[in-house]
Regions:
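Catalytic loop of short-chain dehydrogenase/reductase
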Residues: 115-119, 127-131, 137, 157-203, ...
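A short, exposed helix-loop element centered on a Lys and neighboring polar residues
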Residues: 149-150, 195
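Active-site-adjacent segment of SDR/Rossmann-fold oxidoreductases
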Residues: 33, 196-206, 262-265
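A short helix-coil junction within the Rossmann-fold of NAD(P)-dependent oxidoreductases
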Residues: 40, 102-103, 116-121, 151-160, ...
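Active-site loop of short-chain dehydrogenase/reductase
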Residues: 18, 77-78, 105-106, 155-169, ...
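Short-chain dehydrogenase/reductase
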Residues: 2-103, 114-127, 133
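C-terminal helical subdomain
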Residues: 210, 230-313
Length: 313
């Protein structure tokens, strides 16, 4: 299918003067959030556990927070790398103190910490899942988000700002059981956090939204299929549903559009997909397409509708 030229989410100056922090920005959607916010002119603090000198439990030395910060600056913003383990409250307190000392406020917080792909035991019963691995998933997907929000949101409420919780799966999809109790809880919690934080933030003029990408062409996913961003369609022979996959930039453009929207309060408390945001704001993926992966899964994969994946991009 031929698509039109790529359409960005915002102008190069839409977020000029804004201060953003992307927690979990080493790779994948997190890196893209940081870069796209930077491309709109924001100053972006990028955090994560993998640095030039240390590799996290994810086990990928190929992406670092320093590299992400450099990409933010290259895109037109100011990238600031702050290596941080968001499960350590003291490290997050130091991070908050640095942002306060530098700018006195925070306008955009993207809570994207995870790094638990290597722990997911699809199809395994609770009692067959090693307890330490299951609890680690909850640490990475829930506890880290609570620590981050608790210690950084006091900076965000000083001026009307945007808090984004990031999960995997639409609200409709996450109402289904996600094949393992620990993983299910880890991915449903951000949806509930956004709903609860919406009430907490509204009196301060701030907004909380939960956002999910679709079938994400992250570095890790591409490596798993043995393809690159250039030849990713070669993976369709192994996984036909990958035809609705999207680049990390797509969901990141959605978050950038939210951040630049003075009327974003209408999204407060909602859980939205990259496809929904693209339909609302008119941006596209980097190849000019507009994937709607979760609608495809709901209607075709789960719902039995007879339609091909190309009609959902």
């Amino acid at each position: 299918m031929t698509h039109s030229a790529s359409v960005p989410a915002a102008s190069p100056t839409a977020l000029e003067g804004r201060v953003a922090l992307v927690a979990g920005a080493t790779r994948g959607a997190g890196r893209a959030f940081a870069v796209e916010l930077g491309s709109a002119g924001a100053t972006v603090y990028v955090t994560g556990r993998t640095t030039r000198d240390k590799v996290s439990e994810v086990g990928r030395a190929t992406e670092t927070v320093e590299e992400t910060a450099a990409l933010v600056t290259e895109a037109g913003g100011e990238g600031i790398a702050v290596p941080t383990d968001h499960l350590d409250p003291e490290q997050v307190r130091r991070l908050a103190a640095r942002v306060e000392a530098d700018h006195g406020r925070l306008d955009i917080l993207v809570n994207n910490t995870w790094g638990g792909e290597h722990l997911i035991p699809f199809g395994r019963a609770l009692w067959d899942t090693p307890l330490d691995e299951g609890l680690r998933m909850l640490d990475l997907g829930v506890r880290s988000h609570l620590i981050t929000a608790s210690l950084l949101l006091p900076l965000l409420i000083r001026h009307p700002g945007l808090h984004v919780e990031v999960t995997d799966g639409s609200a409709e999809t996450n109402r289904r059981f996600r094949e393992n109790v620990f993983f299910d809880l880890a991915k449903y919690a951000p949806i509930r956090m956004a709903l609860g934080l919406a009430r907490d933030l509204e009196p301060h003029g701030s907004t909380a939204v939960c956002v999910t990408p679709g079938f994400l062409r992250s570095e890790q996913m591409l490596d798993g299929f043995g393809v690159t961003e250039e030849n990713w369609r070669d993976a369709l022979t192994e996984e036909p549903h990958f035809a609705v996959a999207e680049s990390p930039a797509y969901v990141a453009r959605g978050v950038t559009a939210l951040a630049a929207d003075p009327g974003r309060a209408r999204w407060n408390g909602r859980s939205v997909t990259s496809g929904t945001l693209a339909e609302e704001y008119g941006f596209t993926d980097t190849d000019g397409s507009s994937p709607d992966g979760w609608r495809y899964f709901e209607e075709v994969v789960f719902g039995g509708k007879e339609a091909g994946p190309e009609s959902y991009r």
